[in-house]
Design a protein with these regions (language model features):
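Short, solvent-exposed interaction modules
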Residues: 70-96
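Vicinal oxygen chelate
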Residues: 1-4, 45-46, 82, 91-132
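N-terminal beta-strand motif that seeds the catalytic metal site of vicinal oxygen chelate
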Residues: 1-20, 75-84, 132
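Conserved active-site tyrosine of GNAT-family acetyltransferases
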Residues: 21-26, 94
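An N-terminus-focused feature that recognizes amino-terminal "leader" regions
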Residues: 24-28, 40-41
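Conserved short beta-strand elements that form part of the metal-binding/catalytic scaffold
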Residues: 32-71, 111-132
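Conserved acetyl-CoA-binding loop of GNAT-fold acetyltransferases
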Residues: 27-34, 97-101
Length: 132
């Protein structure tokens, strides 16, 4: 895989309330919100920023990962997502290099995309999502 084929897909931001967070992105920055989706115990609203998206993540499950993140760290950047041309190959290279994965095999995320998360202990403290 060449680095030129990898790109930033989106940044996920954990918020207690999308309704409270949305005015800044919509009214101040002029970003257009998409339709809310539910995945992984969270309501997700994506806002296009060129080829990159900002995802606002509000917990819909009190025991889900976004709720746990907010309880431990408060609102803020939850994850960074990279689009890779070959998700299965990227996960295999992670395993071969000894990087800790949260998802050993791809699963379906928001919008039906194939996704997998790499543990923050493997990536300098940043939760990374990979998608193809």
């Amino acid at each position: 895989m060449t680095a030129s084929r990898v790109r930033v897909s989106h940044v996920g931001i954990a918020v207690p309330s999308i309704d409270a967070a949305l005015p800044f992105y919509r009214d101040v920055l002029g970003l257009e919100p998409g339709q809310p989706e539910t995945a992984d115990g969270a309501t997700i609203v994506a806002l296009a920023l060129g080829d990159v998206h900002v995802e606002l993540l509000e917990p819909s499950d009190p025991d889900g990962p976004v709720a746990r993140f907010l309880a431990k760290r408060g609102p803020g950047i939850h994850h960074l997502c990279y689009h890779v041309p070959d998700l299965d190959g990227a996960l295999e290279r992670c395993r071969a290099a000894g990087y800790r994965l949260i998802d050993d095999v791809p699963r379906r995320g928001a919008g039906g995309r194939r996704i997998a998360f790499v543990h923050p202990k493997a990536t300098a403290g940043i939760l990374l999502e990979l998608t193809d």
